[in-house]
Amino acid sequence: MKPVVFFLLAVLLSGTGCQTISYYTQAAKGQAQVLFGQQRICEMIKDPKLPEELKGKFQLTLELREFARNELKMNPGNNYLKYRNLNRKYVLWVVYAAPELSVKLETWWYPIVGEFTSRGFFVEQDARKYAARLQEKGKDVFVGGAPAYSTLGWFNDPVLNTFINYPEADFAELIFHELAHHHLFISDDATFNESFATAVAQIGVARWLKSNRGIEQHDLYLARCARRHTLSELLAVGRNNLKKLYNSNKSESEKREGKKKVITSLKMDLVTLSESDPGYRKVAVWAKRPINNALLGARSVYHRRVPAFFALYEESNRDMEVFLSEVEKISRLKKKKRDSILAEYETKSRAKINSPINQN
């Protein structure tokens, strides 16, 4: 509890306003809720009353930690050695927002991490109230549930009930994603951080499946990643079309009408994709949900630079030590230079790699 109290006091003493104090108060309470009531996984596994499925997932967690250490060259520290049941579906509800006629996400400033493109709440109602206030100001908003988050080394992150029942590959993906944040996180660049973690997670799962579950499971996962990549590309096209519209010389009323047409066209393309192959069936859900600047921006944060990191991984001869070393070098550059280099790698990715992680 002491680190939580210290963190809250630091915020209170920094001269922030009432709304900010209220926000960090709920954040401190929420983090405390995650910290208290944790159980050691090594002790839980010994309990003969523990369901076999849960025991298996805990054993898998320990296995993934070692795989991350030995094969992915990321130190797991003391993360994922404990379990916490929060008795709810998500640990956080995350709010994204963007202006009505811009694809650029709103940002919020936080201690330590700097500017970030989302606002997280431990109570769903709080997130939706905050989103409603932004909507009243004319913003596009999107609220999404998060099963996990990284405390970036301030605390040891536990396994949570919010993702314990995930299928193996999804579970491993989440663990590797969050450990990637522990390994490398830079301030003021959410797209770099999340795209890097997404790439590492997919690379890690592909390697883990090939080593531990066989080539069939590995290939099925790669096919799934390729479908995800196709969806991301389609959504990126829609977002880019909106960006061109917003940057045009058209009037605001013309832009609003154009926005409706672009989103309608995007939804039609999503339906077409969902009907093109049984593997894309779930894409139909995207066509039914409200699509706006905030939703497309949130998706972009997690996927925009993923192809660039895949290309860098390939150029590193799939050597994780070399790959991570190169990423760390890029991370130390100024944002403009960093983006330029990643854009070059993205071009290489499009030219050479058909699958997002081509590991045959």
Can you describe what each PLM-predicted range is?
Residues 35-52, 107-116, 289-290, 307:
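Acidic/histidine-rich, surface-exposed loop or edge segments in extracytoplasmic proteins
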Residues 64-228, 240:
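Acidic/His-rich structured neighborhood in mature extracellular/periplasmic domains
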Residues 46-50, 63-73, 180-184, 201-213, ...:
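Sec-exported extracytoplasmic/periplasmic mature domains
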Residues 32-35, 44, 48-62, 121-125, ...:
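Soluble non-cytosolic domains of exported or imported proteins
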Residues 1-4:
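Positively charged n-region of N-terminal signal peptides that target proteins for export
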Residues 6-16:
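Bacterial N-terminal signal peptides
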Residues 16-39:
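Bacterial Sec signal peptide processing site at the extreme N-terminus
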Residues 233-360:
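Pan-zinc metallopeptidase signature
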